Amino acid sequence: MNHIYKLKSYGIGTDRRFYGVANKTLETPDFLDPVRESFDWFLHVGIPEAFDRIFPIVSANGKLEISFRRGSLRVEKPENEYLAIREAKIKGKTYSARVYVTLVKVHSEDGEMEEQEILLAEFPFMTQGGTFIINGFEKVVVSQLIRSPGVCFRENVRNQQADDLFNKVEIIPQLGSWMEIFHKVTGNQVDTVKFRIDKHKNIPLLSFLRAIGFTNETVRKYFGNSPELLESIRRHKLESLEENLELIYRIVRKDDRITEEGLKNLIPSIIFNERRYNLASTGRFMLNAKLNLVERISQTYLAEDLVSKKNKILFKKGTYITRQLALEIQEKFNNEEIPLSEIEGVDSTIYARQLEITRNENLWKRFYVAIVKVWPNKKSMLQESEPVNVIATDPNLNEKTLVLSDIIAIVSYYFNLLSNLGKSDDPDSLVNKRIVSVGELLQNQFLIALTKIEKNSKEKISTKSDLSQLTVKSIINNKPIYNQFKNFFNSSKLSQFMDQINPLGEMASKRKVTSLGPGGLNRDTAQFEVRDVHTTHYGRICPVETPEGQNIGLILNFSVFSRINQYGFIITPYYQVKNRIVDYSKVHWLAASEEFDKSFAQSGVEIDQNNRIIPDKLTVRKNQTYLVLDAEQVNYIDVSSMQMTSISASAIPFLENNDANRALMGSNMQRQAVPLIKSEAPLVATGIEEAVARFSATNLRASISGKVTYVDAKKIIIDDGEKPEIHYLRYFEKSNQETLILQKPTVKVGDKVKKGQLICDGPSTDNGELALGKNVLVAFSTWYGYNYEDAIIISEKLVKDDVFTSIHIQEQTIKFRSTKAGNDILTAEIPNASAKSRLHLDANGIVIVGSEVDTGDILVGRTSPKGEDNPTAEEKLMAAIWGKKALAQKDTSLRVKNGEGGTVIDVQILSRDQGDNLEEGVGMLIKILIAQKRKIKVGDKMAGRHGNKGVVSVILPVEDMPFLEDGTPVDIVLNPQGVPSRMNIGQVLELHLGMVAKKLKTKFVTPVFDGIKIETIKKLFDEANIPESGKFKLFDGISGQPFENPVSVGYMYMLKLLHMVDDKMHARSIGPYSLTTQQPLGGKSQNGGQRFGEMETWALESFGATSVLSELLTYKSDNIQGRNLLYNNIISGGKIPSPGTPESFNVLAYELRGLLIKLEVHKNDQENQEVEEIKDPLELPEIPSNFIDEYNQDGRIELNKLEEFADFDEENIDFDKLTR
């Protein structure tokens, strides 16, 4: 009866049934390795590299030089990471390391050398968990996805401003000016080709080419006779080099005066100066890869013989060039079998000038290019029409700047595209995008700081006459480095407060990728194309996980297996396939650019025992599309079924059965699940839960192999026979999101452990597996309308048994200041405080740990000097003569904030006397940590893993819940209407499989895209004696009658999310008002009111609720005098005054005045009541104040005299209403 399955072990002794078909999947890597490797690169490569770019620092007169001694870098870390981090968090410090370097000072006159090691900086150091502790808070540096340096050719690009289409090429450096060559392709006339540097005005391309030494003849010789080029030559009138340089100078340096020296330096300073223009290794790699021959000469015909250095014909004229042949021709140029051509007819004045400045002999070598003449098609070959020159750059270039060969090859490629040679690039492809990781971001900050140090040092040297007195230490000031890092970690968009709700959220925030930030995109202007999922994202960036809202598609997550190569491109692993045989011995890591023309099969392909692919035909991925090919044509196979998705998306079982939008919500909401008091791993898992638990920083792994000799709630000691190693556990710590971090040991004294083994369960972890929620019995049924619109009905059992109970920790702080008026005093004797509020204080006035405190209770007793606001001259004189008199003290104690009562779990006292570093004027700081036990209640948000979210609407007694035939009451009732339209069928399959798991007392693992098939679930129904439909007879708990139809009932994994009603529920009676508008503030944090807006006003107007409206728009809003008067009258028992003018009316009057409309308000004193009347510019008949107007049924105004009313009480007339 059993369908074939394997038992796989997960976590600490949990066996799960696996029914998938994937053969050998690659083990999940340590998810934090890329972050740690990047920081390691910064320390050992990035810092020395930055020094090489800036040093040696040479004085203006050349007499003094300061250089950096390679290999002298020394990093001094704190000895015990755990204790250093704990201290940093408690005391609000930064966890940092000291970096020392050795610098050498050389006097050129006497050759005297002085070597000195200096403290370069103390900057934030990465923890083992891939985070930084900045001012006591845990932060992460997010990776950035930006356009790669290099060259990007694009055809038919739409201009933002107009509807014209353009061809263009962008030359993108890592540092320096962006350059563009472009021309319009729409319109009747042939357009000239233009050139642009940064956002400056357009320059004719001919001007730029002339400025670097080309003549009309050389331009035509190298770049052919396309109509656009001929038109550009025809229209261009400036002949000489100087005239063209002058034109460019006026545009690029429009505010500078033209000098001969300036003209000579213009082009070299923009392009050839490595300090100002740098392609970096990535840019050079991209240029060499793009500007070769292969793409352009494939599928063309040779128009001349290709001859070797020994004059041997290697490739004959008329040969059809396949891609393979094109690769061969390129290879011959690479190893110089076919000689490169020297660029002729170019005026090398600029290069001579550049050579003079930089003494860079390599510049002369860069006058060589690879030239091949081809016919684009057979027709042009047969007609022997003029061939097209295809020019490639020198393949052995390694310069970090542009050189002449590059410029010629770029212009050649641009004109080749007009002959349909080569292909345009996709700027949204990962071929043209790279990742800037934490190490590179820190290196950029370090470079900026070193540039400032260089400038300061040169200034310092120039002011000293006697250079011998200067030491390295006195010249180099490390303050810029400290300031630069401080600014970066505190204010950069890429340095973010870590999401620490649960281990999954923490892992996801460390693997986040953003397209925003400096040098990136702007969320307001980013187009749909940039945000869209791209085919190159496969295995590199998750297509599912991204935020909802305006950041959609701009903030992304790495896929499970993705890594970053030396150039910053994302690489993903594959197994190679040759002649249907899969080679599992070696993993091949490929970047997006290396996937061209290769075919990739999925990991779920059936493979026999000899690793041979069984099916003859397969659906494969090739060149951004899916094809059905023979098995022999497959080149690679995926390493795992979860290769495409991120960690969060991979944790959703039956992901393949869900709509992508709901999967997106599911992966985002899993990160918001609060850790519960008792964690429980899911019955239906995906297999990634163990990896998340193992690599999470909230769990602890053994640092050595050995025997456990001691275990308690705060530490575990492991002895390897040489030296016992103490592992400290995190005990009742507060996370960034105020959830609880508590580690519980999973080992006992005497256990033997291996290095890297989990030795404790952290928050949301159960036996070494991620456990975000609970397995509960769920029925899909309606129940008296209480689960209408995604509302959730839960059983009281979940509340009583603390199933969804979580602990939250709030921190409250108080500072004791010293001022001129006097000092704050810590005391238990607080003036005018009730005995009840002081109940939990000790003799010093600090709350006792373990106390149960409620809103308004005093946590720390503090009195502050009242201070006299404006003492008179006589009082000042008396104080000066007799000394300060004892000022009266006022109560400024720290009280429990509204809704933040709970159990005091810790008191932390920081004092200047103990050597703690506190801000100016603060002598002592006390932190109180209060733990709140929150049971689930009406208004809390809950969710499953499939994007099925809702709010608890009612908590029913167990006896009222619907129950099964055996009397088992269900825990949760969900609305079945929430499934069909959302198309997340995964939740139904999980429900059924969960029921099977419970009946068979087993657990399942169903990885994404390799899960249990529906046929298998049906067979499992038989095994578990469950009806084939998976539905059960359900009875109403109230009436005891069975429901009309069978209902789907099963076990589903439900999460309680951070959006809890306790944080959101709020009401206001009296509170603060805005200073500018005089209207109540908004929001719970400011004790604000509920905004009653324009549309709400319309609703009341439609009902004619005048008195309610009058109150809302005046007393309760911005009628300043009215509300004060009202308050006083309520206190004194007086009558409610009539409403005056709201402040917003005055704003309207000022607004109209700005539009030159004068609004007059005439006030008549009548019976001591103010009557405001607004003169209308139209002359309407004046209605006397002793008339009431009212509409009759015809809509005409009828005027009734007041005298007709017998019981007329003059005192109670609201004259404001009359005039209105």
UniProtKB/Swiss-Prot annotation:
One of its GO terms (biological process) is DNA-templated transcription. GO terms for molecular function: DNA binding; DNA-directed RNA polymerase activity; ribonucleoside binding. CDD domains: M23_peptidase, RNA_pol_B_RPB2. It catalyses: RNA(n) + a ribonucleoside 5'-triphosphate = RNA(n+1) + diphosphate. Transmembrane segments: none annotated. GO terms for cellular component: DNA-directed RNA polymerase complex. Its EC number is 2.7.7.6. Gene3D superfamilies: 2.40.50.100, 2.40.50.150, 3.90.1100.10, DNA-directed RNA polymerase, beta subunit, external 1 domain, DNA-directed RNA polymerase, subunit 2, domain 6, RNA polymerase alpha subunit dimerisation domain, RNA polymerase Rpb2, domain 2. It holds the Pfam family RNA_pol_Rpb2_6. Keywords: DNA-directed RNA polymerase, Nucleotidyltransferase, Transcription, Transferase. NCBIfam families: PRK00405.1. This is DNA-directed RNA polymerase subunit beta.
